[in-house]
Amino acid sequence: MKALLFLMALLLPSGAGAEEIIGGVESIPHSRPYMALLKIVTEEGHVTFCGGFLISLQFVLTAAHCHGREITVTLGAHDMSKRESTQQKIKVVKQIFPLKYNLFSNFRDIMLLKLEQKAVLTPSVNVIPLPQSSDIIKPGTMCLAAGWGQTGVKEPNSNTLREVMLRIMEMKACKDYRHYDNRFQICVGIPQMLKLAYKGDSGGPLVCAGVAHGIVSHGPGRGIPPIIFTRISSYVSWINRVIRGN
């Protein structure tokens, strides 16, 4: 896994493919206690990785395209090449999608993971708040994305958690995305800055003023922003219903 290089690449929509952080820096160890690393065994038996984030003691939020036959979540991690005492590895017992998730357009690219057991909250493991359904982040706002994905288009994943600051863009900046819908998605990243989330970062959060507003979804594949995040505020009611019912 790698570091955040220029968080400019895009997230792959196929299977459990994820993106990387390009143009970023290594996070201060355990300063993002909500971060989760997903180890995914695909339907074909391959192993891949995505990001995610803890939103309650027993639920992690991620991207729907990060689904798989089996998923194990690691919480409290910074350096995945080490057996850190802060880490909690928990199996996923249920993968829950919204109705009408579209794999080809990445529309409704959001998934809830129910953990086999509740996470133990520590200084290295904690939940992150979600927005209200009426909350909207304005273009020009700077937000943080983090992950263990690639640090460059031809680079491997990062062993350590990396992060990058990204700008919320006007919807017209994503006009080249055929299926972009500003009601359910967020356009993120300045093309000239070459900073973004890339392969391996899929499913990770977009954090604005301490609140998770987006989920890394997909991009153009060339490592050039803007990229698309799922807009969490549009799904808060669904998220709350699922958690209450499980």
From Swiss-Prot:
Q: Give its localization.
A: Secreted; Cytoplasmic granule
Coiled-coil regions listed: none
Q: Which SUPFAM superfamilies match?
A: Trypsin-like serine proteases (SSF50494)
What does UniProt give as the signal peptide span? 1-18
Return the EC number: 3.4.21.-
Which tissues is this chain's protein expressed in? Mast cells.
One GO cellular component term noted in the UniProt record for this chain: extracellular space
What EC class is this? hydrolase
GO terms under biological process? protein catabolic process; protein maturation; proteolysis
Instruction: List each copy of the Peptidase S1 domain by range.
Output: 21-244
Q: Where does this chain mainly localize?
A: secreted
Q: Which UniProt keywords apply?
A: Disulfide bond, Hydrolase, Protease, Secreted, Serine protease, Signal, Zymogen
Any one GO molecular-function label of the UniProt entry: peptide binding
- List the catalytic residues: H65, D109, S202
Write down the superkingdom of origin: Eukaryota
Q: Which SMART domains match?
A: Tryp_SPc
Q: List the disulfide bonds.
A: C50-C66, C143-C208, C174-C187
**Prosegment residue ranges:** 19-20
Q: Which family does it belong to?
A: Belongs to the peptidase S1 family. Granzyme subfamily.
Q: What is this protein called?
A: Mast cell protease 4
Lineage here is: Eukaryota, Metazoa, Chordata, Craniata, Vertebrata
Q: Which gene encodes it?
A: Mcpt4
